[in-house]
Amino acid sequence: MTTPTAVALEDAKVAFRLGDGRVYTAVEKAHLAVAQGEFVAIVGPTGCGKSTLLNVAAGLLKPAAGSVRIFDRPLAGLNRDAGYLFQADALFPWKTALDNVAIGLEIRGTPRAEALPRAQKWLASVGLGAFANRYPHMLSGGQRKRVALAQVLIRDPKILLMDEPFGPLDAQTRQVMGNLLLDLWNADRKAVLFVTHDLEEAIALADRVVIMSAGPSSRIIGDWRVTLPRPRDIFEVRLDKEFHALHREIWSVLKDEVMKGYAQSTQAAEAV
C-alpha cells in the first residue's frame, strides 16, 4: 500500500513586494514531498528561505505560484493538520507549565477538567511531571522547550513543523532534546519538516536531508536519504562511519552555498 503524502509543494514560488516597489523572490520552483511518518530536515545558508518554506506548509504564506497539498488536498488557509514549534518560546509567562500545555485543548473547547489531566500526562511524557506548577521563568531553556513540545503534541497534529526549535540551547541540551524528540516521534511517526542550520543535527534526526541554495530565488538543490538504522541515539550516531561519510558528501555541496550567502550578505552590507 502506498504511503500517503502529508505535505507536497509543487513548483512553489514565494515573493515579497519591498517598500520601494521592487519584488524580491525568496524561493523559486520548490518541489518537496514529505510522506506520512517521514522525518525531513531542511538545511541551507542563513536567509535562504528555509523558514519561508515552513510557513508555506503551515498556510501562513501563500505562494505566488505553484501549489501546496496536504494529504492530497489543496491547502486553503491555515494548515489545520499541522503543529508548529518555533525557535522562540511561545509560552505564556503568567501561566504554569501545566496551564501552558492545557491551553491548546481549552481554546478548542475541551473542558478544563478534561484538559488538565491530559496536560499532566504530556508533561510526564517529556520528563516534567514534577514541574507542572512552575512558571516559565522558573524553568531552564531546555525545560521550556519540553513544555513547548508538549504544548504542540497534546493537540495530536498529523504534521510537525519545526523551525530551529533547539537553536537557542547549548550543545548538550540540544542533543538531549533531539533524543527526546526521536523517542516521541517513534511512538506514532508523524510527518516532520524540521528546519536547522546544523547539518550534524539534521543527519542525526532525519530520514532525508534537503539542501537549499543561497538566496535570493533559492531552490532545493539536493536531497539525501539517511540510511542510519533506527532507533538512534543522538550521542552515539555521530560516531558512526556512515554518519561521517554522509556529512562529508552533503557538506561538499552545502559549503559552496554557505560561502555564496556570506559573500552576498557582505556585499549588501557594504552597499548600505
Where are the language model's segments positioned?
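Helix-to-loop junction immediately C-terminal to a conserved catalytic motif
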Residues: 58
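Conserved ABC transporter NBD signature motif
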Residues: 66-77
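Short coil-to-helix segment of the ABC ATPase nucleotide-binding domain corresponding to the Q-loop/switch region
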Residues: 95-102
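Conserved ABC ATPase "signature" region
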Residues: 102, 106, 113-131, 183
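A short, proline-enriched helix->beta-strand linker immediately N-terminal to the Walker B motif
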Residues: 154-158
